């Protein structure tokens, strides 16, 4: 091997390997201290891009779970208030049945009506004060809101809540009353019919025909009607007037009353009535109140059922989101996180190579001194 002074190839080679070992040491220490094997694009450009997408997806899934939990909390808050609304309506129905009894005097019915009015006020107070995060839930202002339960756009679910105020039409229906009362001894003169035509809540046309026989009285007519349809309720007041009630939860629009008896009895045009109109100070009002409150209870039960389904759906959505998030994070970890067993091995190797390169470099730097011995 030639001996020269100007170019020390051995030292240059040792220096190159020393630099490589030092760079390996630096990378290993960076990965071990940060916990990530990809700390910059130069480490793995494709891996960095994929891991960043997975990070965005994971963060989106975390937020979707939070949104879903907020949705469940809103539904639970509303459903809890509706539970008390149901209790109040049940109490009002009990009072209406109590007032319908003939043993009550006028003053007793007025006392019952006072409690009914107080309960009506409490219904409205609950509807106006039930809120979540500043949003009123039961006074009709909530409407429909979307809840983002996915990591990407377009993955939203709508929640709708109507008004639970006592004066909302969904908590009532239409009332039809005979124009004139009939005497206690009134009877059907000859076999005839009474027809009720309407459209039910499902949009289906319905016609109920009541075939009355000679000698039937108003109470029997009411019994016939109630026996043939659940959509329209009939009762008779103390003034001898037949009255019909069609709940908004069962009938869309008006009920057309026809047939021979329909013309003979003569009904007024339907008027909108709600829980706010309940008046149990008369027998007729008490009878109608029972039908109104039954419709209101159905309206509340229907809304509560929707909220229950909403909560169950969101519960399953959260379980699925957690499962997806777990797998996304596992994938991201495999791509980006440091494998400490492998990296400590790599660092140990780099340390040994660095020490060896340093020793070799020191020896290589002594090679040019051999030229001095030749000159001496």
From Swiss-Prot:
Domain of life, per UniProt, equals Bacteria
Give any Pfam family that matches: Flagellin_IN
Q: Which GO terms describe its cellular component?
A: bacterial-type flagellum; extracellular region
Q: Which UniProt keywords apply?
A: Bacterial flagellum, Coiled coil, Secreted
Sorted alphabetically, which Gene3D superfamilies does this protein's record hold? 3.30.70.2120, f41 fragment of flagellin, N-terminal domain, Flagellar export chaperone, C-terminal domain
Q: Which residues form a coiled coil?
A: 103-129
Q: Does the keyword Lyase apply?
A: no
> Any idea where this protein resides?
Secreted; Bacterial flagellum
Supply the InterPro entries for this chain. Answer: Flagellin, Flagellin_C, Flagellin_C_sub2, Flagellin_hook_IN_motif, Flagellin_N
Question: Which is an annotated GO molecular function term of this record?
Answer: structural molecule activity
What does the further note read? V.cholerae is able to differentially regulate the flagellins within the flagellum maybe to produce flagella which are particularly suited for motility within a given environment.
Q: What does the function comment of this entry state? A: Flagellin is the subunit protein which polymerizes to form the filaments of bacterial flagella. FlaB is not essential for flagellar synthesis and motility.
State the similarity comment. Answer: Belongs to the bacterial flagellin family.
- How is the quaternary structure described? Heteromer of multiple flagellin subunits including FlaA, FlaB, FlaC, FlaD and FlaE.
This one is known as: Flagellin B
Name the species this protein comes from: Vibrio cholerae serotype O1 (strain ATCC 39315 / El Tor Inaba N16961)
């Amino acid at each position: 091997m030639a001996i020269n002074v100007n170019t020390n190839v051995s030292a240059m080679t040792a220096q190159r390997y020393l630099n490589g070992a030092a760079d390996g040491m630096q990378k290993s220490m960076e990965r071990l201290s940060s916990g990530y094997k990809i700390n910059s694009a130069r480490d793995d450009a494709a891996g960095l891009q994929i891991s960043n997408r997975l990070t965005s997806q994971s963060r989106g899934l975390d937020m979707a779970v939070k949104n879903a939990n907020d949705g469940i909390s809103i539904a639970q808050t509303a459903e809890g208030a509706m539970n008390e609304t149901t209790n109040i309506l049940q109490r009002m129905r009990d009072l209406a049945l109590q007032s319908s009894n003939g043993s009550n005097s006028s003053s007793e019915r007025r006392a019952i009506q006072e409690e009914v009015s107080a309960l009506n006020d409490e219904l409205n107070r609950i509807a106006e004060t039930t809120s979540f995060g500043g949003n009123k839930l039961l006074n009709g202002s909530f409407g429909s809101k979307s809840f983002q339960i996915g990591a990407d756009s377009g993955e939203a679910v709508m929640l709708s809540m109507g008004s639970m105020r006592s004066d909302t039409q969904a908590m009532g229906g239409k009332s039809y009353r005979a124009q004139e009362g009939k005497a206690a001894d009134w009877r059907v003169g000859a076999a005839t019919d009474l027809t009720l035509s309407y459209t039910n809540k499902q949009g289906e046309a319905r016609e109920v025909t009541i075939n009355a026989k000679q000698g039937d009285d108003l109470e029997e007519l009411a019994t016939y009607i109630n026996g043939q349809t659940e959509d329209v309720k009939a009762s008779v007041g103390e003034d001898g007037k037949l009255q019909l009630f069609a709940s908004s939860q069962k009938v869309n629009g008006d009920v057309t009353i026809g047939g021979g008896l329909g013309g003979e009895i003569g009904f007024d045009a339907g008027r909108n009535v709600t829980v706010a109109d309940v008046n149990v100070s008369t027998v007729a009002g008490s009878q109608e109140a029972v039908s109104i409150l039954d419709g209101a209870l159905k309206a509340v039960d229907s809304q509560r059922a929707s909220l229950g389904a909403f909560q169950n759906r969101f519960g399953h959505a959260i379980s699925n989101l957690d499962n997806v998030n777990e797998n996304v994070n596992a994938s991201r970890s495999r791509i980006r996180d440091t494998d400490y067993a492998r990296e400590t091995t790599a660092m140990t190797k780099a340390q040994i190579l660095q020490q060896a390169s340093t020793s070799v470099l020191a020896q290589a730097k002594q090679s040019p001194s051999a030229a001095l011995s030749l000159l001496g």
